[in-house]
Structure formats: C-alpha cells, structure tokens
Amino acid sequence: MNDHVIYTQSDVGLNQFFAKIYSLVGMGVGLSAFVSYLMLYPFRENLISILVNQPMIYYGAAIIELILVFVASSAARKNTPAALPIFLIYSALNGFTLSFIIVAYAQTTVFQAFLSSAAVFFAMSIIGVKTKRDMSGLRKAMFAALIGVVVASLINLFIGSGMMSYVISVISVLIFSGLIASDNQMIKRVYQATNGQVGDGWAVAMALSLYLDFINLFISLLRIFGRND
C-alpha cells in the first residue's frame, strides 16, 4: 500500500476517495465469498468434520477474527503499510467462519439474503451520501442499540428462544442499515475535515467499517429469511 497517496480537495477527489473505499469493500466481500465457496463445496467434508469433531477450530478462528479487526483498524488509522494486508487476511478468515453459518441454510436463502443485503447497502449508501441531515446522533444511537443486541444475543444463547432470535435479527437489520448510511456520511466528513488530504490508511479504515456493516446485515437477513430452513 502506498502511504503517500493523497486525494485532492474537490468533487473529483471525493469521488476518487469513495471509489478507493468501495473497491476495497468489494475486494473484502469478494474474498470472503470465495473462501466461503471453497469451504462449502470443494472442502465441504472438511467443514462438516470440523463442525462435528473439531469445533474449537471454528471458535479459535472467530477469536482471531476479533483480534484482527482491532489490529486492522489501528494500523489503518496510523496509515501503516500493514493495514491493507491485515484487512484482506481478516476478510479471508471471515469467509472461513461464515461458511459454518451459511452451511445451515438453503442455497436459495443465501442468494436471497445476499441480494437483499446488496440492495439495502446500495440504498442506504445513497441516503448517507446525499442527505444533509447530521447523522452523528443516529450513529451514536445505533452503536448503543448494537451493545443491547450483543447482550441480548448472549442471553439468548442460554434461553434458545426462536422468537427472540428473530427480533434480534430484525433489530440488527435496522442497526446496520443505519450504520451504512452514517458511515457513508462519515467518509465525506473525514474528507472535508482533512481538506482532502486523506491517505490510503483512512480508505482502509472506512472500508473495514462498511465491510463489517454489510457482512452483519447479510447474516441478519440470512437468519430472517432462513427461519424455515
């Protein structure tokens, strides 16, 4: 990654910044999808074997994922060359762990959830870019609600309520839809606050945020659409 790439302050510069971010999001989602495909088809027997005989591999990967999110975010904000490789490694590992979730659903359900996620992502991105309303308050509310969802999800691990799981998924869709819009507005604010002097590190940081929004939106919609799978 070139640490010295600078985007000039202008509509063209802002568009270039957005293009850079969305190309990174596309790379991340594409890499995750590719790894998930490998696990679900060529290596399906290995996936099932891990689920049945070695579930700690999955949990270990999930823990490493969590660590990589913080490492990638920190590296990106410091504009270090390691930020992009870490982001891509995280995306690949996330594809691995996602396959253990996706395997429980019908193929049509997965495609339906993915296409719906893409449509929501596109619509909310436009809203975030075009709206004149300050969404910083909404952003704080969404993060507060997200904490509540995490707590409720942990509680439901012990309760095992199907209805509670459904409600959590619906609320999660609303939360991540709001975050997609606010993150897109944040991209504009970061660009404007730095007078257009933003390097690749910020592009990776914002791409990571949008990637996480999309993946979590996809998982939430997958659970909603796949209730009967």
Swiss-Prot record:
The keyword DNA repair does not apply. The chain crosses the membrane at residues 21-41, 56-76, 83-103, 109-129, 141-161, 162-182, 202-222. Belongs to the BI1 family. One of its GO terms (cellular component) is plasma membrane. The keyword Hydrolase does not apply. It is found in: Cell membrane. This is Uncharacterized membrane protein SPy_0358/M5005_Spy0301. It comes from the Bacteria. InterPro entries: Bax_inhibitor_1-related. Keywords: Cell membrane, Membrane, Transmembrane, Transmembrane helix.
